[in-house]
Structure formats: C-alpha cells, structure tokens
C-alpha cells in the first residue's frame, strides 16, 4: 500500500476497533462526541477532507457538495443505502461514492422477522403488562391473543440481498413467499424459496397477510406505499418496514391504524428521523423501534472494515470494490 495518508474526516463515532485501525492507516479526524454534524460543520469538513466518511444521519446534498474543495475525491459512506448523498452531484464533481453492501443483510433480515413476530404475537404489549404497567392478573384462555404466522402469505417488496434473506427465514417459519421486484429473481432462487413473483404490486398487496418493505429509498420508491396502495391491503394484514421510512406514506398508515383498517404495523425506520410521526406514536397496533435493524456489534465492525477497504483501495489508485454507479440508483 502507498505510504500516503489522506485526510479522512469521520462524521460520527464508530466502533473503537474501527477507529483505531483508521488512525493507523490514515490521517483521520474523528468525531469524539458522536454529536451529528450540522450543516456548517459538514460544509467545513468537505472543504478540507480528501475522504469523507458520513452515515445515514448526514445529509450530503448538492448545497454541501458545491462547497467541497478539489481535494475531496471519495465519500466512503458508512452504510448500505446512499439516499443521504446526492450521488449524481458527487459524481459530476469527480467524487467517487462507496457504500457497505452485504454486511448488514443477515442482521436486518433477523430483525425483520422479529418485527413480524412482535406485531403478530403482540410481544411488546405483553412485555409492557409485566414491566411498565404491572397489570398482569394471570393467564386467561382469551387474553392477549395474536395471530399464527405459519401458513400466511408474506409479500416482500424488494427481493435484493435483504429481501431474499427474509424470504429464507420466513420459509422456515412456514410462510408462503411472494415478492414484488423490478424483475424476477433467478429461477433457482424462486425454486429454493418456493416464491411467487408478482409484476403488479397492487395485486400482490391485495392478497397478502403480511407485507415486508425491503427496497431502497430512491425517487422511484418515495411513498411507494401510498394511501391508495395501503387501502388495497386486507383489513387484518400487517406491514413491517426495515428499509427506509420514506417508502411509506406515514400519515396514511397512521390513519388506517387509527380506523382499524389494518391489523398492525412494525416500523424500524421513519421519514423524518429521529422525529417520529405523532399519530404513529399514538397508534395502538404499531410497534415502533429506533432504527435498530442493523444494530449488532459484528455488523458495525464489518461496516467499518468495508469502509477501510474502500479507502485503502482508492489510496492505492484502484477503483474501490463497493463503488456506487449511476446504474445502481
């Protein structure tokens, strides 16, 4: 590897082992307080950094990128999704963008199944009865009844790495696998999962018992689950989202939950994080969690290792392995 040590600015606190390695390899400026950078701080960072390492909480938009100095040549995103970055503007200014695909697949798929179980079996409600409410009066044949998931139809929106991993887990639980994607997956994968492809999202939504959102947030998927589409779902159906909050019309979802027009929702992501739609907070049939889907020690370290490899490869004069291309957006 080249002995040159580029100035790398990291916007958030990363696992200690990752930060230690980055300090060894690069001229690294860390965020010791883990306080999210404001707009002014981000603008200052891009004026001096050769490499910027942002996270999902950092909005690297055109306004920020237009203030970047000529030395900024790589944005090594600490995350799989790149909807926090104006990739088109970055590329037009000769800035390479990378992400960390693959390493969060299993963790997010595990969490998706946990949300399905939490909503279907009312697990969070039960925990509150024992804990915060302390109102449990003993077992009853008709108390706290949820729904069996075995044999139900699961509709997966977005059959990429995470969607496919969810399907494998769901099949083991006895769910029938259905999916909507830009195109069908490989026939061998369909055969393995006994999965049914739906070209029409509308038709799939109307027939599913459970819907799992696993697609990225892009201009094409912004509020993909609109009020009109949500109304197509069965009254007793549930929806879980471990992708991005922007994919669902949150106000429409809240209205339907309030009116009893949906069986429940499990949400780990929100459109205006960390703010959460007040109507969702009041919805009795909603399980709301603070963007924990990929939150494992192993996953965060793996993400950091991906970032380091991307930076090292770039320093050595090669294309980073996880370069984001226009065709991927």
Residue ranges and their predicted role:
Residues 1-98, 206, 226-228:
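An N-terminal-biased, well-structured beta-alpha scaffold segment characteristic
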Residues 11, 155-157:
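Conserved N-terminal Rossmann-fold NAD(P)-binding element of oxidoreductases
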Residues 12, 55-56, 79, 208, ...:
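Glycine-rich, N-terminal phosphate-binding loop of Rossmann-like dinucleotide-binding domains
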Residues 50-51, 74, 210, 238, ...:
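Short, Asp-centered acidic motifs that coordinate Mg2+ and/or phosphate
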Residues 60-64, 182-279:
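Rossmann-like adenosine-cofactor binding region
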Residues 93, 97-98, 111, 222, ...:
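Rossmann-like dinucleotide-binding domain for NAD(H)/NADP(H)
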Residues 101-153, 165-168, 179-182, 187, ...:
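Phosphate-binding beta-alpha-beta segment of Rossmann-like dinucleotide-binding domains, i.e.
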Residues 162:
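Hydrophobic/small residue at the entry helix of a nucleotide-binding pocket
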């Amino acid at each position: 590897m080249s002995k040159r040590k580029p100035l790398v600015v990291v916007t958030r606190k990363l696992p200690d082992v990752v930060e230690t390695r980055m300090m060894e390899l690069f001229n690294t400026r860390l965020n010791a307080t883990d306080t999210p950078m404001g707009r002014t701080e981000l603008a200052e960072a891009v004026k001096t950094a050769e490499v910027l390492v942002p996270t999902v909480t950092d909005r690297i938009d055109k306004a920020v990128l237009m203030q970047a100095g000529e030395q900024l040549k790589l944005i090594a995103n600490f995350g799989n999704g790149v909807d926090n970055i104006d990739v088109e503007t970055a590329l037009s200014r000769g800035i390479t963008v990378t992400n960390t695909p693959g390493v969060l697949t299993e963790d997010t798929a595990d969490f998706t199944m946990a949300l399905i179980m939490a909503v279907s079996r009312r697990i969070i409600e039960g925990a509150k009865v024992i804990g915060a409410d302390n109102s449990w009066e003993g077992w009853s044949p008709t108390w706290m009844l949820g729904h069996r998931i075995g044999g139900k139809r699961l509709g997966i929106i977005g059959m990429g790495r995470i969607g496919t991993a969810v399907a494998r887990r769901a099949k083991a639980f006895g769910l029938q696998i259905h999916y909507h994607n830009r195109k069908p997956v490989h026939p061998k994968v369909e055969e393995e999962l006994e999965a049914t492809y739906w070209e029409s999202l509308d038709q799939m939504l109307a027939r599913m018992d459970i819907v799992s959102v696993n697609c990225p947030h892009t201009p094409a998927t912004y509020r993909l689950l609109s009020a009109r589409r949500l109304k197509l779902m069965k009254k007793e159906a549930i929806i879980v989202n471990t992708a991005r909050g922007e994919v669902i019309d949150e106000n429409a979802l809240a209205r339907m939950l309030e009116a009893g027009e949906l069986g429940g929702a499990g949400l780990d992501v929100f459109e205006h994080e960390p703010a959460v739609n007040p109507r969702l907070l009041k919805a009795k049939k909603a399980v709301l969690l603070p963007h924990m889907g990929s939150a494992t020690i192993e996953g965060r370290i793996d993400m950091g290792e991906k970032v380091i490899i991307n930076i090292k490869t770039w320093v050595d004069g090669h294309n980073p392995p996880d370069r984001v291309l226009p065709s991927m957006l």
